[in-house]
Amino acid sequence: MAKKSLIVKQKKHPKFKVRAYTRCERCGRPRAVIRKFGICRLCFRDLAYKGAIPGVKKASW
């Protein structure tokens, strides 16, 4: 789990736009964030298995 201070710091609008970075909206993880959904791969996997993300299903080929 991410530090509360870093989550709050990231939510503020940065002075320069290059300082902005993606962070998971659900758990606050800074790495492996899927931009389209705004959540990290771990949260994405969890929600996909539960069927909470419409149109996403497990791949099989």
Swiss-Prot record:
InterPro entries: Ribosomal_uS14, Ribosomal_uS14_bact, Ribosomal_uS14_CS, Ribosomal_uS14_sf. Pfam families: Ribosomal_S14. GO terms for biological process: translation. GO terms for cellular component: cytoplasm; small ribosomal subunit. This is Small ribosomal subunit protein uS14. It comes from Malacoplasma penetrans (strain HF-2). Binds 1 zinc ion per subunit. Its cofactor is Zn(2+).
